[in-house]
A protein has these predicted regions:
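Charge-dense polyanion-binding interfaces
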Residues: 428-437
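A short linear hydrophobic-aromatic micro-motif
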Residues: 73-75, 209, 317-321
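Conserved N-terminal alpha-helix of the aminotransferase class I/II PLP-enzyme fold
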Residues: 38-80, 104
Length: 437
């Protein structure tokens, strides 16, 4: 065969039997019913249906997901939750509207601000000093912002966060609906939660969930749900703007099979995973429910040096999802066996874990000088951080922690933000620069 560098690299790594504590949720184990993908890789034909026209077997499969999540409608996404967030904000807002945005939102939400020319009012989260992460969104803070900015049309938040922090979605929905607004939830990391209990996801008007992150489904497979005013036709129209006109049939079939698999035995496996994570949280320094409401399966280890802890795990062929200066984030799923957890526990005994460093709370956001749209589409250049003072950021400067942009697109880089970034060690990384106009 001709030279195949990517395929060779992937197969060589897989052959090393890495313990995959990262997404995708299938962990490299066979996906149910998908032994011969080529046999079901079709295009839009009368027997196979059309994702963006609705109906048929695709529509039936989507309706079963909607029923499972207790939502009115569901649309399969083959462009990941990024496609879903863009589509959801397209439905929730008209160009030029004002949106209340969780400042810790995924970059797809920031791109939606620019593409739709939305005006952001940023919503801060409380800083949990001992845990070294941001906490849940406060309904009281949302109420304050809606009173101060009655022009807000929608609230877009992330729940759960990368660190597994959950917000009170029923309370947030009540506040938004009382003010006539729309609740958009980026639940990319929470597709598994309905199999573990009621976490309020169905209170959202628009909900995005990444099956590939925490369920046995292939990369990029995700789901967009709606309630109330947003019909299935609305979902199809908005998602088709950002998705391929040739969506993958094997990927859509995998979503169908994933749901059936979870109902047949995956739920029991996920409950076992939650029990294993609870046990590890007791034995090793980690975020717990004493810090904040958490996804019961997200394992966030605490360490004096998160990057060193990550390297120590990787040296034992255990591969985390990510690390920051004080944490290592692991994503156990229903695909992880008891022997996988035993292997993880043995590896953790060789890692220096302990309280995370005392990171300061994020600074007050800088002045907004341009809209996100103006910032994204303007010419740009790169400057070292210390030379960027007074310039306008064209992209996020978002170190972990805190996991939220210290400087958002369109904001002016100021002394206070530079000092904070240096304080948390952002400038110690190689070749750090900020894009400016």
């Amino acid at each position: 065969m001709e030279n195949t560098p990517l395929y060779d690299a992937l197969t060589a790594f897989a052959a090393q039997n890495p313990l995959r504590l990262h997404m995708p949720g299938h962990k490299g184990k066979p996906l149910p019913g998908l032994d011969n993908l080529a046999a079901i890789d079709f295009t839009e034909l009368p027997p196979t249906g059309n994702l963006f026209e609705g109906g048929g077997a695709i529509g039936e499969a989507q309706a079963l997901w909607a029923e499972l999540f207790r939502m009115d409608s569901c649309l399969f996404l083959t462009g990941g939750s990024t496609q879903g967030v863009l589509a959801a904000l397209t439905l929730a807002c008209q160009p030029g509207d004002t949106v209340l945005l969780d400042r810790g939102s995924h970059r797809s939400a920031y791109n939606a601000l620019a593409l739709l020319d939305l005006k952001p009012v940023y919503l801060d989260r409380p800083w949990l000093a001992r845990a070294g992460v941001t906490g849940p969104i406060s309904p009281e803070r949302v109420e304050e912002q809606l009173t101060a900015h009655p022009e807000i049309k929608a609230l877009c938040i992330t729940s759960p966060t990368y660190y597994g922090v959950l917000s009170d979605l029923p309370a947030l929905a009540e506040v938004m609906h009382r003010h006539g607004g729309v609740l958009v939830v980026d639940g990319a990391h929470g597709a598994h939660l309905p199999f573990l209990g009621d976490y309020g996801l169905s209170e959202a008007d628009l909900l995005v969930a990444s099956a590939h992150k925490t369920l046995p489904a292939p990369g990029q497979s995700a789901l967009l749900f709606s309630n109330g005013a947003f019909s299935h036709a609305d979902l199809r129209r908005a998602a088709s703007i950002y998705g391929s006109s040739s969506p993958s049939y094997p990927m859509m079939a995998a979503l169908d099979l994933c749901r059936a698999h979870m109902l047949e035995g995956g739920t029991k496996a996920y409950r076992r995973t939650a029990e294993e994570v609870a046990r590890l949280r007791e034995r090793f320094p980690a975020l717990t429910e004493q810090d904040a409401p958490l996804d019961p399966t997200r394992l966030v280890l605490c360490a004096p040096d998160g990057y060193a802890a990550q390297e120590a795990l990787e040296a034992q062929n255990v591969w985390p999802e990510m690390a920051d200066g004080g944490h290592v984030v692991l994503i156990p799923t229903c695909a992880d066996s008891r022997s996988d957890f035993a292997r993880l526990e043995e590896a953790l005994r060789q890692v220096a874990l302990g309280p995370c460093p005392g990171y300061p709370a994020p600074t007050v956001p800088p002045e907004m000088a341009l809209t996100p749209r103006q910032a994204l589409f303007a010419p740009r250049k790169s400057l070292p951080l210390e030379q960027a003072e007074g310039q306008v950021a064209a992209c996020q400067v978002a170190p972990y922690p805190p996991g939220v942009p210290v400087i958002a697109p369109g904001e002016r880089v100021d002394k206070k933000s530079i000092a904070y970034l240096k304080q948390i060690g952002y400038n110690t990384l190689e070749d750090v620069s900020v894009a400016v106009l």
